[in-house]
């Protein structure tokens, strides 16, 4: 797509990211692993709306947009990377007069797309100062205009001039009215609030509230759609069809439970709340099954065929009882509550607890070699003969990557082999405990799961009275025990555990965050005998004192991580703190908060991300911290020392929905593919990834390489040296042995812009990169050819 309006956004605070964050991925610009490239991974199986513009069918799925070329059947994806101006799409609609597509975003942004794929952005509503929602509830196209139903009234948008023409406050004395639906019949505009019908002649002064006349709607709870048809205004309310004619409402009983109306060309369809398909509304307002096809959300007529937006099968084209399904590749759920990489396989789990994504259908998604594998809730529940909700964590067998376990916050522990269910574990067939003994089917809460170095599977079981820690041996034997405070022998009750973190210094040390109720941290030392708790030592702390003697008592703990310096990072509901390696957790409740000095000459400091809810912390190959917050997007920070030896915090990047393609500022989870440095952000609106400039360092230089290699004249991106050891210095020289530039690695890679130390593009030729570790004990050499 082409942009006809370019909007300036806030620059990222970074020394590495360029203004051209979205690198061109055409053949001329070399596609694999392009630095700083974003890629959206959206669930496209459930289609909410469709619209046709010329030979293109647009489909809205889970707030994201893709299209199908009716001639070539090619699928294209449309997002901020391709020119759209925001991320969370609420509605799409086709203007037949201009043959243009309107895209309406949840935040009030509007894009208009014509037949040539040119995009014009209308941001007036987005920038409007208003405390009420800017979400567009409904759209009615009329000639060259679009009438928008808003929570404060009606907006008239001139699509030809690409501007908002007027805003109508239609309540008494021009007060705000929440308009849910809008339609036009015979030059009369009909705007529906929840209980009242507002009407006015389209040519009247609609800005004058006195021209708007009111009448009651049929009594009911929910309006589910409105369309003009057969000289009547038709609505669906409380699953029943009603029509309005001569100022009178008439109910049209049906044996079906209706849930919406869709008008396409001269036909009106009702959508039903079951698997029947779409029923055509006949001129006498009787119903006739025209398109028998499962659960349909939207329908568009195209000659002798219909295009359907379906619940589970993507977009479907049907003609003469022949059906063709269009399935874009991707996950099946946009909730990425937890993610975890095992080598190059990424597991994505939709789950949650408390008020966060709670009661999400249990589904398993994993991404490997560019391909998504999805296991639906229906497949899993059919195999288990048991409902499954809120998948929380995954543990993959270190000896067989196809064998893994999934924990659930309510429905037990699921054992899988590839895509097949092996066993569902509940209290009736395992040592698991239920938080509600009388309802084990819904309250068997498991969260943390991991394999230790001996091949034992650890599971933390929330809410049971006794034996909350389970260790399953490689032979399948269950061993269950309590955590006991070492000095008092008091039982440490596990209410809501987080993930188990195995300490890098000693695999016998397990850090266990207790997230709420008895919020705190437990350090368990199992003495190398995890199935025998008698020699265990557990230390449990709920409060700490920072370097300024401030008392820290977290209300909630959401995440912990350990960096390459063995510092433990703790993310809470109000910021973060650290437990450096030199502090002995078993003997001291000391901690440190990360502070940022103000640049105002006062020498005052602020704590890093103070009062932010920290959902996740992940450490990359360069020991930098990727931090996901509940409201402010994602941060990439680096901790060092200034010239005076004081802690120096460098914010390398801060990604939000305003300055990047990030899908939501609520970042639920982050996972990094160690081999490539690609960072995956699981948000409340879906999953998106970003190729960073750091990967895990290698143990030697045996796998060193450069890419792209050769570098063609059309390539404008970075040259990347991969397979480096930690703290590698890369000295680039030309064929005559002259020094060109010196680079330093971020973990296992270093990037070069193809310029010399004076900022000039180097000449064509073969360049040698001599790589040395900081201690000089190892070196490697790689060559790269540059053609200008």
Locate predicted features:
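Sec-dependent N-terminal signal peptides
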Residues: 4-13
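Carboxylate-rich, polar loop motifs that coordinate divalent cations or form catalytic acidic clusters
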Residues: 4, 20-704, 730, 739
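Extracellular and select intracellular beta-sandwich modules with Ser/Thr-enriched
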Residues: 778-782
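Short, glycine-anchored, charge-dense loop/turn motifs used at functional sites
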Residues: 729-740, 767
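Short, surface-exposed loop/turn motifs with a glycine/proline- and acidic-biased composition
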Residues: 80, 745-776
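Positively charged n-region of N-terminal signal peptides that target proteins for export
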Residues: 1-4, 788
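Glycine-centered coil/turn sites that cap beta-strands in beta-rich domains
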Residues: 699-731, 749-752
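Terminal processing/anchoring signals of secreted or surface-associated proteins
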Residues: 693-697, 706-709, 737, 752, ...
């Amino acid at each position: 797509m082409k942009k006809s309006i370019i909007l300036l956004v806030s620059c990222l605070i970074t020394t590495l990211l360029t203004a051209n964050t979205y690198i061109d991925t055409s053949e001329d610009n070399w596609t694999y692993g392009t630095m700083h490239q974003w890629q959206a991974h959206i669930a496209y199986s459930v289609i909410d709306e469709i619209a046709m513009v010329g030979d293109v069918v647009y489909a809205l799925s889970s707030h994201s947009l893709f299209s199908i070329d009716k001639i070539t059947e090619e699928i294209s994806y449309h997002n901020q990377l391709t020119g759209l101006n925001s991320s969370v799409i609420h509605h799409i609609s086709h203007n037949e007069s201009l043959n243009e597509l309107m895209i309406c975003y949840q935040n009030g942004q509007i894009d208009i797309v014509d037949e040539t794929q040119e995009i014009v952005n209308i941001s007036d509503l987005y920038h409007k100062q208003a405390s009420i929602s800017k979400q567009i509830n409904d759209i009615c196209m009329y000639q060259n205009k679009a009438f928008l139903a808003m929570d404060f009234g009606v907006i008239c948008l001139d699509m030809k001039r690409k501007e908002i023409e007027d805003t109508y406050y239609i309540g008494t004395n021009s007060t705000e009215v929440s308009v849910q639906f809008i339609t036009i019949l015979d030059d009369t505009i009909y705007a529906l609030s929840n209980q009242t019908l507002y009407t006015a002649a389209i040519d009247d002064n609609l800005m004058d509230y006195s021209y708007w006349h009111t009448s009651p709607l049929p009594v009911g709870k929910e309006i589910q759609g409105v369309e003009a048809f057969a000289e009547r205004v038709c609505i669906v309310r409380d699953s029943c069809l009603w029509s309005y004619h001569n100022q009178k409402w008439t109910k049209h009983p049906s044996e079906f439970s209706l849930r919406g109306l869709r008008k396409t060309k001269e036909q009106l369809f009702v959508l039903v709340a079951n698997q029947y398909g779409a029923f055509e509304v006949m001129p006498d307002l009787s119903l006739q099954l025209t398109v028998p096809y499962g659960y349909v959300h939207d329908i568009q007529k195209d000659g002798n065929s219909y295009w359907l937006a379906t619940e589970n099968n993507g977009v479907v084209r049907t003609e003469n009882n022949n059906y063709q399904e269009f399935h874009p590749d991707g996950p099946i759920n946009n909730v990425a509550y937890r993610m975890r990489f095992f080598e190059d396989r990424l597991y994505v789990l939709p789950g949650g607890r408390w008020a966060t994504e709670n009661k999400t259908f249990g589904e398993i998604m994993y991404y490997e070699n560019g391909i998504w594998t999805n296991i639906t809730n229906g497949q899993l529940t059919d195999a288990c003969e048991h409902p499954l909700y809120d998948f929380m964590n995954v543990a993959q067998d270190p000896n067989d990557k196809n064998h893994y376990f999934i924990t659930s916050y309510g429905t037990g522990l699921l054992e899988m082999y590839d895509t097949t269910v092996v066993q569902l574990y509940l209290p009736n067939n395992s040592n698991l405990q239920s938080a509600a003994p009388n309802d084990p089917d819904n309250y068997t809460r498991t969260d943390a799961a991991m394999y230790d170095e001996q091949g034992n599977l650890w599971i933390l079981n929330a809410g049971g009275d006794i034996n909350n820690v389970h260790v399953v041996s490689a032979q399948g034997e269950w061993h269950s025990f309590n955590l006991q405070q070492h000095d008092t022998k008091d039982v440490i009750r596990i209410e809501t555990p987080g993930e188990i973190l195995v300490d890098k210094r000693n695999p016998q040390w397990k850090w266990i965050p207790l997230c709420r109720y008895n919020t705190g941290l437990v350090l368990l030392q199992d003495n190398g005998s995890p199935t025998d708790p008698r020699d265990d030592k557990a230390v449990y702390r709920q409060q700490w004192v920072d370097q300024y003697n401030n008392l820290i008592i977290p209300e909630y703990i959401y995440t912990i991580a350990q960096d390459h310096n063995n510092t433990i990072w703790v993310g809470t509901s109000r910021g973060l703190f650290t437990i450096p390696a030199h502090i002995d957790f078993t003997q001291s409740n000391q901690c440190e908060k990360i502070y940022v000095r103000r640049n105002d000459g006062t020498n005052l400091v602020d704590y890093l991300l103070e009062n932010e809810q920290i959902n996740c912390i992940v450490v990359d190959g360069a020991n930098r911290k990727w931090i996901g917050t509940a409201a402010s997007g994602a941060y990439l920070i680096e901790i060092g020392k200034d010239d005076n030896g004081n802690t120096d915090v460098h914010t390398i990047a801060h990604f939000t929905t305003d300055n990047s393609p990030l899908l939501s500022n609520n970042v639920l989870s982050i996972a990094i593919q160690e081999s490539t440095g690609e960072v995956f952000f699981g948000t409340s609106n879906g999953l998106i990834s970003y190729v960073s400039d750091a990967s895990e360092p290698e143990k030697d230089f045996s796998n060193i390489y450069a890419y792209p290699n050769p570098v063609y004249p059309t390539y404008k991106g970075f040259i990347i040296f991969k397979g480096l050891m930690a703290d590698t210095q890369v000295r680039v020289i030309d064929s005559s042995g002259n020094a060109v530039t010196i680079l330093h690695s971020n973990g296992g890679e270093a990037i070069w812009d193809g310029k010399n130390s004076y900022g000039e593009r180097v000449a064509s030729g073969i360049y040698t990169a001599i790589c040395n570790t900081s201690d000089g004990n190892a070196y490697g050499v790689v060559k790269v050819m540059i053609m200008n």
